[in-house]
Curated annotation (Swiss-Prot):
Name of the gene encoding the protein in the UniProt record: trmD
Amino acids binding S-adenosyl-L-methionine: 112, 131-136
Chain's role: Specifically methylates guanosine-37 in various tRNAs.
Gene Ontology terms: cellular component: cytosol
Reactions this protein catalyses: guanosine(37) in tRNA + S-adenosyl-L-methionine = N(1)-methylguanosine(37) in tRNA + S-adenosyl-L-homocysteine + H(+)
Keyword field: Cytoplasm, Methyltransferase, S-adenosyl-L-methionine, Transferase, tRNA processing
Species of origin: Trichodesmium erythraeum (strain IMS101)
Protein name: tRNA (guanine-N(1)-)-methyltransferase
HAMAP family, sorted: TrmD
Pfam family, one: tRNA_m1G_MT
Assigned EC number: 2.1.1.228
EC top class, as a word: transferase
Length: 227
């Protein structure tokens, strides 16, 4: 999987992409990230990437020329998707990550900034994606979230496939409670069923906990087909 990230702040990605599970995945060449600064594709001496909005308004708008030039400079793999990170896009969910990890080999992520991005960038974009119903200073954090969510689903990133299958949202439910040693901490005890060694009973208990937790915390998931 190849990620090409169009961003004015490439340094923002350095530490997260070299740490933990993501860092190991990139070191093993399971995925590759290419950071592209559109400022390098400007044609004026000031390297200007933004300008005032036609019709007036507060804030600056990212110009289309550097974005187009940056994207068009990239190699084109056969299964490619160009994604704009914007609060106006569809919200990320586990089903989206599965689709991107399975169906594509190149994801180009365009990080918006300032007041917005020139609407004509739509002619480049396959889809718009949002981290949630809130506004951030730019698309870098959503891009990191998307990269993280997709890379961990690629074969070889997570040691055991069943680790992924049992997680929140993979079954459409939240995850069950997890416990480790000690069995008794300040009077709070691990449920007896988890100490029993009875695998069928443990599986039944975990599923019941998933249902209860989902009904209590995220009842919308029980009605939502997206996940």
């Amino acid at each position: 999987m190849r990620f090409d990230v169009i961003t004015l702040f490439p340094d923002f990605f350095t530490t997260p992409l070299n740490s933990g599970l993501l860092g190991r995945a990139f070191n093993k060449n399971i995925a590759k990230v290419n950071l592209v600064n559109p400022r390098n594709y400007t044609t004026d001496k000031y390297k200007k990437v933004d300008d005032e909005s036609y019709g007036g308004g507060v804030g600056m708008v990212l110009k289309p020329e550097p974005i187009f030039a940056a994207v068009e400079s990239l190699p084109t793999l056969s299964k490619r998707e160009v994604i704009l990170l914007t609060p106006q896009g569809k919200r990320m969910h586990q089903g989206l990550f599965r689709e991107l990890a399975t169906d594509y080999e190149q994801l180009i992520l365009i990080c918006g900034h300032y007041e917005g991005i020139d609407e004509r960038v739509q002619y480049l974009v396959s889809r718009e994606v949002s981290l949630g119903d809130f506004v951030l200073t730019g698309g870098e954090i959503p891009a990191l979230a998307l990269i993280n969510g997709v890379v961990r689903l690629l074969p070889g990133t997570v040691g055991k496939a069943e680790s992924l299958e049992c997680e929140s949202f993979e079954s459409g439910l939240l995850d069950y409670p997890q416990y480790t040693r000690p069995a008794n901490f300040r009077g709070w005890k691990v449920p007896e069923v988890l100490l029993s060694g009875h695998h069928a009973e443990i599986a039944r208990w975990r599923y019941q906990q998933q249902l209860q937790r989902t009904k209590s915390r995220r009842p919308d998931l029980l009605k939502n087909d997206d996940n």
